[in-house]
């Protein structure tokens, strides 16, 4: 789930996500390990992807949460990520689940996908990490027939979201609850990422249009939100809940 914000910074970003790899799945929403949330994501994938068997490129695959779900549904998946550490976890899980024949991994930038064609290009919570999201989306258009983005309004500067984030952070410190990541994402890096802090999904839809994809449509993932809220202990599910969306588009009109 990684991409460098500028030329020369890739080592720094790769190191961040490599350091995150060993503990990343400790957060249930990262690993999609909660049975209810897993079922909600399985339904979301089934509705957005073409019928299996089909070839899937999972950009920013991370530890393979989405790749493995897709493989379970019968898809042949190629996982792409900048971090070797994250992909090592994905490969380990694929082997443990008996899915190694359906999931293969490649280390590389999200903006430089492997040669296609793929029936569908998917990503989950990745666009915010990319310094040129329109350019990346355009590169995916070169290798994919359909685009499926699973996104949310992360890091919103809205007052209500910031207030909830502040309350959750303070409460986690009091309760000594481990954070979602090994360290905060560097602020100077965030400043270079156009989609890092979104008040709404409008910039996401605009980026897809600008990249040249056709027939763009969007739907709120209310079942995923509901499932994620339920598996978190109160009040974290409420404090940390954010709107999530699936955006689908096609290479040809």
Where are these regions (language model features)?
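Conserved class I S-adenosyl-L-methionine
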Residues: 1-52, 148-178, 222-224, 239
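Class I SAM-dependent methyltransferase SAM/SAH-binding core
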Residues: 57, 63-111
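Short conserved loop adjoining the S-adenosyl-L-methionine
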Residues: 112-116
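A conserved beta-strand element that flanks and buttresses the S-adenosyl-L-methionine
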Residues: 122
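A short glycine-rich, Lys/Arg-flanked "PGG" loop and its adjoining helix->strand segment in the class I
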Residues: 134-146
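Short alpha-helix
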Residues: 195-212
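Conserved S-adenosyl-L-methionine
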Residues: 213-225
């Amino acid at each position: 789930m990684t991409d460098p914000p500028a030329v020369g910074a890739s080592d720094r970003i790769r190191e961040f996500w490599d350091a995150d790899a060993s503990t990343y799945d400790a957060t249930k929403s990262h690993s999609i390990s909660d049975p209810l949330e897993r079922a909600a994501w399985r339904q979301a994938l089934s509705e957005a992807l073409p019928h299996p068997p089909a070839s899937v490129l999972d950009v920013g695959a991370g530890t393979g949460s989405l790749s493995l779900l897709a493989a379970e549904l019968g898809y042949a998946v190629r996982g792409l990520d900048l971090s070797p550490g994250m992909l090592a976890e994905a490969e380990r899980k694929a082997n443990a689940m008996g899915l190694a024949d359906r999931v293969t991994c490649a280390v590389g930038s999200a903006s430089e996908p492997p040669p296609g064609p793929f029936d569908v290009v998917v990503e989950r919570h990745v666009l915010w990490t990319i310094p040129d999201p329109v350019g990346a989306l355009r590169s995916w258009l070169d290798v994919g027939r359909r685009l499926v983005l699973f996104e949310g309004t992360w890091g919103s500067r809205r007052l209500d979201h910031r207030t909830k984030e502040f309350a959750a952070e303070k409460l986690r410190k009091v309760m000594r609850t481990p954070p979602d990541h090994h360290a905060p994402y560097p602020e100077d890096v965030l400043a270079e990422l156009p989609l890092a802090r979104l008040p709404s999904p409008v910039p996401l839809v605009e980026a897809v249009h600008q990249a040249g994809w056709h027939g763009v449509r969007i739907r709120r993932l209310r079942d995923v939100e509901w499932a994620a809220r339920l598996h978190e202990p109160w009040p974290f599910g409420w404090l940390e809940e954010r709107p999530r969306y699936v955006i689908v588009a096609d290479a040809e009109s």
